[in-house]
Amino acid sequence: WLFPHRGTELYSDKPPMLMWLQAAFYTVTGNWRVAFLLPSLLAALGTLWCVQDLAGRLWTRRVGLYAAWALLFAFQFTWQAKKAQIDPLVTFFITLANYGLLRHLLLGPAWRWWALGWAAAGLGTITKGVGALALLMVLPAAIAAVRGWPRVRVHARDRRFWLGPLAFLGAVSVWLVPVLAVALSQDLPEYRAYLDDILLRQTAKRYSQSWDHHQPAWYHLGVMASMWIPAVLALPWAIPAWRRRLRRRDPRYLLPLAWWLLVLVFFSIPDGKRDVYIMPALPMMCLALAPLLPGILRRRLPRALLLALALLVALLFLAGGASVLSGVGSLPERLREQRGLDPQGIVAGGWMLLAIGAWGLGCVLAFRRRAVAALSATLAGLWVVFGLVGYGLLNDASSARGVMAAAGRRIGPEAELGLVAWKEQNLLMADRPAATFGFKRPWDEQLQLAVAWQAQAPDRWLLVLEDALEHCLDPQRIELAGISNRRRWYLVPPDAVVAPCEATPEERARAAAGQARDLEE
């Protein structure tokens, strides 16, 4: 529980909060798929509630509903909420922290909410280090209070102010104190390395000296413009309105907008950037945008823009479905080569795309005078159909389930299996205990250890990623196990090793490049 493992190695990329929740839900449900998805689902629902309730308290109940709908239909939010990843959870804790802080700063004094906000930031920190960014909300509030803005107070002179920092330390200590106590008492080098990695390398060093996901400084502007659709389409009308309200010194706009700007600057400074990094700022954008949406949506041009977006989505899916079913274009080939879909799966995928496109076109025609309804219905149909049909079609290709099932059938129930250049899902979805030879260890060294392990007993097989194959393996004897996550996996039987596995410079460079790419993902 304190030190999760990835195979035989300690997992120090992230604190274990997400894994705690998944393990707890597995204890309750006994189903790994449900246990993996529940944290993201509940976190997304919690984020929606925070935004809806806070907007309702700061303005009106109707504004709260606008804020929640804007967030729900933002592409990045919905996409991530349907995946078993850490980002919806950290977004929830940051949003909950913002909720508590704003309840105190704008509607307070409310010391319980103040303490809850800091505690949520602490829980966000032991989920993913950036959870503490929620506390930046105090900075614009303090500046506004000093400059005499109405209806905003930090109440820093009150002794109860320190309940917040204490709550933050208490939440962080839930994980940090026992981890430090156990690691320092063990006096084992792997535990010291774990502390160095998770407390220093994965935080300060990753920020100051990013070694992966290199992107230009303006990268997150493109992410927001493309992945925060449709809410972001209102910005040309919202920005002048925000400017007017800031001139009137309305802190309800200043605090979420200033915090959004601070988060954007924070994530734009390092070279390493990913699209999900900026997602925790999306709820605050929707909060500040919501009071303006009723007026913006009464304008003709914004409504035309939303209707055009719905039509574009429908036409793109219709074109994609027609391409897949007719075999014209590169899409069918990509589904076959990169996703490993069989002909039946490709045909089913084509009909799914056509169904989504037809639904969208029908929504545009039925609600052509109600652009918001047309786009909302189109996006709702897209997510429902894709969730019910698309995930089933792509499950084997987007996870290791298909490859591991095929490998298990091929080698038989009595054989042993070793993994080289593996991902966590390979180990999870294997139908038997599998031998591993390190995760961060270079792939060529993994292969050497795996071949030595294979030679120690009969009926041992290796599952090897294509980029980790070397000249020591007879290409006529290895077998393609399948394709998952756009990668080809090969089974290596005992008689396929025909020479010592000493990687050539070209093989070592190819493996190193592939491993770096995998670690970036």
Residue ranges and their predicted role:
Residues 1-10, 17-20, 24:
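Extracytosolic helix-loop segments that constitute the early lumenal/periplasmic catalytic or substrate-binding loops
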Residues 352-359, 370-494, 508-520:
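Short periplasmic/luminal acceptor-recognition loop of GT-C membrane glycosyltransferases, typified by
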Residues 38-58, 96:
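Transmembrane-helix motifs of polytopic, lipid-linked glycan transferases
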Residues 119-120, 132-275, 284, 291, ...:
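Transmembrane-lumen/periplasm boundary regions of multi-pass, lipid-linked membrane glycan transferases
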Residues 51-73:
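Transmembrane-helix signature of polytopic, membrane-embedded enzymes
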Residues 50, 90-107, 285-288:
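Specific aromatic-rich, kink-prone transmembrane helix
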Residues 57-58, 62, 97-116, 124, ...:
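Membrane-interface transmembrane helices that cradle and orient dolichyl/undecaprenyl
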Residues 37-40, 79-90:
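Short acidic/glycine- and proline-prone juxtamembrane loop motifs at membrane-interface regions
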